[in-house]
Amino acid sequence: MSVLQTELPSLSGKTCLITGGAGGLGKAIAIAFLKAGSNVVICDINEERVKQTSAELEGMGSLLAKTVDITKLSEVQQLFDDISSKFVKLDILINNAAIMDRFEPVGDVDPELWDRVLAVNLTAPLLLSKLAVQGMLLQENTNGSIINIASGSAKAGWLAGKHPITMQTLKHGLIGLTKSTAAFYGTKGIRCNALMLGIIGGTNLNDAFQNGVHPEGRQKLGEILSGVRPLPCDVKDIAELCVSLATGPGWNVVNGAVIAVDRGWTSIVG
């Protein structure tokens, strides 16, 4: 009896851009796309991490690593110019980069932090998606895919112990961006979907807790997680899902979807 083995689809000739690609989930996604034969572009604001990841992934495939502040349109435009120069076209965009808030409720929210989180987590995906679709539409046979990385906080307030105002509001916005993009460009050969992640291991989120969080927000997080403890998802599994969703068999009919990636957790607490 033969054992059925699953393989990632071949992405030879495809080019994928991953924001926040120098660490955590972004790095895992980059590795998965390199293994699938794709040209991979990673960008990250952390220059040292970009250099380290670039050196680590050297030899795995065709890689372009850039230090970019994705909140600045001029730097994003330069990134797309660099992609065009090296790989000619972009086929897949994964909006993965994000920063944390401090679990502040609306009465205590810091307007400056709000603006910063908004810029990274929502405005930047808009800018990147804008330039991505403009380039994709110029291709002779447009077959583009945009994947937005969202979370359980996009579903309901405090779901998954997530953020009471800033991140929750912005993740809802990211879902709106996903559906709007999918609705307008689906008939033009560009799909846009979102992954609504639960708890994942192997990320940089623990760094955020070193900067201090709202004490009551931290308490709520503990209460929710102790009520129905989620099973964490491995970044490798999420990365391979991104590859399949981008170009895998059967996924070409999936557009505008918000896919829960949490081992069924939101089916219990959602």
Curated annotation (Swiss-Prot):
Record bears the keyword DNA repair: no
Catalytic residues identified in the record: K171
InterPro entries: NAD(P)-bd_dom_sf, SDR_fam
Known role: Short chain dehydrogenase/reductase; part of the gene cluster that mediates the biosynthesis of diterpenoid pyrones. The first step of the pathway is the synthesis of the alpha-pyrone moiety by the polyketide synthase dpfgA via condensation of one acetyl-CoA starter unit with 3 malonyl-CoA units and 2 methylations. The alpha-pyrone is then combined with geranylgeranyl pyrophosphate (GGPP) formed by the GGPP synthase dpfgD through the action of the prenyltransferase dpfgC to yield a linear alpha-pyrone diterpenoid.
Species for this entry: Gibberella zeae (strain ATCC MYA-4620 / CBS 123657 / FGSC 9075 / NRRL 31084 / PH-1) (Wheat head blight fungus)
Biotechnology: Diterpenoid pyrones display various biological activities and FDDP E shows anti-HIV activity. FDDP D and FDDP E show also inhibitory activity of 42-mer-amyloid beta aggregation that is involved in the pathogenesis of Alzheimer's disease.
Protein name: Short chain dehydrogenase/reductase dpfgG
EC class: oxidoreductase
Family to which this protein belongs: Belongs to the short-chain dehydrogenases/reductases (SDR) family.
Alphabetical keyword list: NADP, Oxidoreductase
